[in-house]
A protein has these predicted regions:
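Conserved short beta-strand elements that form part of the metal-binding/catalytic scaffold
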Residues: 65-108, 147-178
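Beta-hairpin (beta-strand-turn-beta-strand) motif
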Residues: 99-101, 118-123, 142
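Short, solvent-exposed interaction modules
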Residues: 106-135
Length: 185
């Protein structure tokens, strides 16, 4: 039998002879057994502006990060440079984004910190579980992202049907490839 307290602790009745006792277990330890996926780490941050050259001036020219690619999608109204921070499994992608058309949606430059991306070890199970929990996703489902990984997005705002959201932050869930899963687990 489990009991949940406001403090975040979950207690479990443990049967022993002659009488049962209650053991406090931190919520973070219990969550792994109830969740069919694991968030492994930060995969990316996406920063938007009207001119990605201005963003690149800071991130590439001043900070010395390396451009590793670019991505353009009329449908998603985005033209982005993909910058790398770190190495190996610790690499974080910094996406410098400008809108293809600043008058169309989505407005990838508003807010300037557009979204964060999280590596997950099992994206389909993650989406199924979070959907059952009432998490709102953006339209489009699981699809290939700019870096070639399967992705989906948690909507920044909840609604009546799906009240859980990114609380003002667009969150990209990214299927981690096997070498990232192994390195970060």
């Amino acid at each position: 039998m489990l009991r949940k307290f406001a403090s975040g602790l979950i207690t479990r009745a443990v049967s022993t002879n002659p009488a049962p006792r209650v053991v406090a277990v931190p919520r973070r330890l219990m969550a792994d057994a109830a969740r069919p996926f694991k968030v492994l780490g930060l995969q990316q941050i996406a920063i938007g502006g009207l001119d990605k050259k201005t963003l690149s001036s800071l991130w590439v020219d001043t900070f010395g990060l390396t451009k590793s690619g670019n991505f353009r999608s009329e449908k998603e109204n985005v033209d982005e440079d993909i910058i790398q921070l770190g190495k190996g499994a610790a690499t974080v992608e910094v996406d410098l984004m400008q809108p293809v058309d600043p008058n169309k949606s989505p407005k990838v430059h508003e807010p300037a910190l557009n979204h964060i991306g999280l590596w997950v070890d099992n994206l389909p199970a993650c989406v199924e579980h979070l959907t059952q929990q009432g998490v709102r996703f953006t339209p489009g489902g699981i699809r290939k992202g700019a870096s070639g990984f399967d992705v989906t997005f948690i909507h920044p705002k909840g609604n009546e049907k799906t009240p859980l959201s990114g609380a003002g932050v667009l969150i990209e869930l990214v299927q981690a490839p096997p070498h990232i899963i192994e390195a970060l687990k």
